[in-house]
A protein has these predicted regions:
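General beta-strand recognition
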Residues: 44, 68-70, 146
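N-terminal leader/targeting segments and the immediate start of mature chains
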Residues: 22-42
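Charged, gly/pro-rich active-site loop segments
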Residues: 23-24, 102-169
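Bacterial Sec-dependent N-terminal signal peptides
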Residues: 1-24
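A short, Trp-centered hydrophobic/proline-enriched beta-strand micro-motif
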Residues: 35-50, 89-93
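A short mixed-secondary-structure module that forms the rim of ligand-binding clefts
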Residues: 61-96
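Hydrophobic/aromatic beta-strand elements that line small-molecule binding cavities or substrate pockets
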Residues: 58-62, 106-108
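A mature extracytoplasmic/lumenal domain signature
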Residues: 49, 73-75, 95, 108, ...
Length: 169
């Protein structure tokens, strides 16, 4: 009976160690994802409208560790209606060195919070928004991301090419 007890203890320790290792790996992936996202000059925002995906290049703001992403846009742009009708979005970021990427999936909402609008404003946008009241924010709560980074040896599956996926709490 004693050998069985020790086997159970060893298995329990291995499971705990494996779970801890996975948590550490996920945290490392999150750190690297933020590095790629925040170094990317532009991103590609994809919305869905009438069963068709529409993508456009966007100038995003830095993402904080809470994995909330903001974009500024014109209140009259098509993407605002797309998001109101279907808040599920995908955003793609290429690494600065072009040796990896992060693709996020999340839920978008529209924010007209004046403090946030002031915070997420670039002076060079004055020429695009002569009437600043047309400026609004898209807030994306990131739910998950896929990541590839040659620099950090994060690669897809050798057979399926499926990249690692990380869920955000």
């Amino acid at each position: 009976m004693k050998p069985l007890f020790f086997i159970k203890i060893i298995l329990s320790l291995l499971i705990v160690n494996f779970a801890s290792s996975q948590d550490h790996q996920e945290e490392k992936f999150k750190e690297i994802a933020l590095e790629i996202i925040n170094s990317a000059k532009y991103s590609v925002l994809t919305t869905v409208n009438n069963n068709s995906a529409d993508s456009r290049t966007m100038d995003h703001f830095k993402v904080n560790p809470d994995f909330i992403l903001y974009f500024g846009t014109n209140i009259n742009s098509r993407k605002i209606n797309h998001i109101k009708n279907n808040p599920i979005v995908t955003v793609h970021f290429n690494s600065k060195e072009n040796d990896g990427y992060v693709t996020v999936k999340g839920f978008a909402s529209i924010s007209s919070n004046s403090d946030l609008i002031e915070h997420y404003w670039k002076n060079e946008w004055d020429k695009f928004y002569p009437n600043k009241s047309n400026y609004i924010l898209i807030k994306v709560k990131i739910q998950s991301f896929e990541i590839i980074s040659e620099k950090h040896n994060i690669l897809g599956d050798s057979i399926t090419w499926k990249s690692p996926i990380v869920l955000i709490d």
